[in-house]
């Protein structure tokens, strides 16, 4: 019997990418589906959604409306992920042609969902921490691995605890076996995922080997054949000295750290319920620079959070100047349902929010230009992962710079030393030495 065709579109974060991989694995290995990039030939169309900001939620309904217009007769449409978790039945009301809704904590029910009319699985208490997922990887050379699910922080702007539930650590033996399996299949790098990865080990569903995130990094680095370990996202509150020292000293841990700032104002951080101050953040970031001079630090920043004054915003710019981030992901505050910040007084005018975002991004561009210029004539070890146009190939350095050289498919999955000859903001161009 010929395979049915599966089309999947993934929006949002790396955790969504891994969730999509899990669903693809379940469907291709257990339900006789094969992936297709042509939506018109698909028997099953999935969209894995994000709800961190308002824009992706609006995009969901425009996308599924487009799916309905082009899908073939009899094809099913499923809405999955975080937006599915918090909108639930509203999706059926606004898009009655959707066949099932599957929240982020319920992806293991995908085979049940495709067989049940108007199936809705949005229980954020459903436990997938020990679910034995079938295996699928979008990349041969890099493997995403969940080490925890959910979040307990309840930051006042964030909807994630309402869509992914409370935080539970995945047992070490499951993580270790998944990493081993990925390496055996050709992966050179594993990418550990969680809402707060460095809070790992605080709570398991059942009794398991006790360890913290630093211990986990050390244990995983013993896997033979594993070259690199990356992770996202750590929480600044849990960046103790032990964690920073393991990060700096373990040669398999990539020297790229994502440190979500959100705001440089201690008052705004308190209103956000982030649990740390500007001083704590700077202490940790500068300690990291001291321990690991070649580290690349990225961050998330929200401007125009309710009540943010010009002085508060200037505090954020001050942190930007002091830490000199290699990369920032910056956004205007987006009001999200079910969050405390949505009903806070002193919501910021859109014009002010846009101006602050522009100011922040322009200042970072100036900083970044100086950072990338310093990379010229340096030599980096690069893992090549992606073919580019014009007989070029791209990969990443240990500290996460994107590097492009002339090269062919035979370099995919290989490490090569590259000397940088021309550094741009988004790409470092170089030559293999």
Swiss-Prot record:
Binds 2 [4Fe-4S] clusters. One cluster is coordinated with 3 cysteines and an exchangeable S-adenosyl-L-methionine. Its main location: cytoplasm. [4Fe-4S] cluster 1 binds at residues 13, 50, 82. Keywords: 4Fe-4S, Cytoplasm, Iron, Iron-sulfur, Metal-binding, S-adenosyl-L-methionine, Transferase, tRNA processing. Catalyzes the methylthiolation of N6-(dimethylallyl)adenosine (i(6)A), leading to the formation of 2-methylthio-N6-(dimethylallyl)adenosine (ms(2)i(6)A) at position 37 in tRNAs that read codons beginning with uridine. Monomer. This is tRNA-2-methylthio-N(6)-dimethylallyladenosine synthase. It comes from Campylobacter jejuni subsp. jejuni serotype O:2 (strain ATCC 700819 / NCTC 11168). The gene is miaB.
